[in-house]
UniProtKB/Swiss-Prot annotation:
The gene is rplY. InterPro entries: Rbsml_bL25/Gln-tRNA_synth_N (IPR020056), Ribosomal_bL25/Gln-tRNA_synth (IPR011035), Ribosomal_bL25_b-dom (IPR020057), Ribosomal_bL25_C (IPR037121), Ribosomal_bL25_long (IPR001021), Ribosomal_bL25_short (IPR020055), Ribosomal_L25_dom (IPR029751), Ribosomal_uL5_bac-type (IPR020930). Gene3D superfamilies: Ribosomal protein L25, beta domain, Ribosomal Protein L25, Chain P. The keyword Ribosomal protein applies. This is Large ribosomal subunit protein bL25. GO terms for molecular function: 5S rRNA binding; structural constituent of ribosome. Part of the 50S ribosomal subunit; part of the 5S rRNA/L5/L18/L25 subcomplex. Contacts the 5S rRNA. Binds to the 5S rRNA independently of L5 and L18. This is one of the proteins that binds to the 5S RNA in the ribosome where it forms part of the central protuberance. It comes from Aromatoleum aromaticum (strain DSM 19018 / LMG 30748 / EbN1) (Azoarcus sp. (strain EbN1)). Belongs to the bacterial ribosomal protein bL25 family. CTC subfamily. GO terms for cellular component: cytosolic large ribosomal subunit. The keyword Ribosomal protein applies.
Length: 201
């Protein structure tokens, strides 16, 4: 089910206006993109604070209801207070159904505890990555990418190229090589060490 929330047009801008909004329980934000003028908005802090705690909110197509109009967006940036549980600012990007999105989605690791190298071989599995940069059309955007650890052997690694991505989804590599997603490390003397067979990044 698509996440929908309401926003209000923000008229006053600047540091002072933003502080007043935050004191009133509102979060200043902006909607931009899709060859349309940027719109300054405010949203309810309590509502968005709880939505931000949901993993799906960060990797889903969202719907903002603003002054009678609906905007299809993705979350692009969140600014948090350095020590308070307070959201300071939000950036949303409008999306076009016919244009590819570039977004980070979380990785979900399965079968860690049933992996033979963990159960019988005295290994532990190190998760090198927790999210993956992808490119896809909005309709193909997955909430997460599953990483199956069942067959990972001691000293071996799973690389990005080995992930089973949903149809229409591509991994976006930054730089050269094939990044490591997870590695099975042997445990010696209380510390985890890669065996000689470990595949380098």
């Amino acid at each position: 089910m698509q996440i929908v929330f309401k926003a209000t047009q923000r008229v006053e801008q600047g540091t002072g206006a933003s502080r007043r909004l935050r004191r009133a329980g509102q979060i200043p934000g902006i909607i931009y993109g899709a060859d349309t003028d940027a719109q300054a908005i405010t949203v309810d802090h309590n509502e968005l604070y709880h939505l931000l705690k949901k993993e799906t909110f960060h990797a889903s197509v969202l719907m903002i209801e603003l002054e009678g109009a609906k905007h299809t967006v993705v979350l692009r940036d969140v600014q948090w207070h350095p020590y308070k549980q307070q959201v300071l600012h939000l950036d949303f990007q409008r999306i076009d159904a016919g244009h590819q999105l570039h977004l980070k989605v979380p990785l979900h690791f399965i079968n860690n505890d049933t992996n033979p190298a963990v159960k019988l071989g005295g290994c532990m599995i190190s998760h090198t990555m927790t999210e993956l940069d992808i490119a896809c059309l909005p309709a193909n955007l997955p909430e997460f990418i599953e990483v199956d650890l069942q067959s990972l052997e001691a000293g071996q690694s799973i690389h990005v190229s080995q992930l089973k991505l949903p149809e229409g989804v591509e991994a976006v590599h930054h730089g050269e090589g094939d990044p490591v997603v997870a590695t099975a490390l042997t445990v010696k003397g209380g510390a985890a060490e890669a065996t000689e067979g470990e595949v380098a990044a």
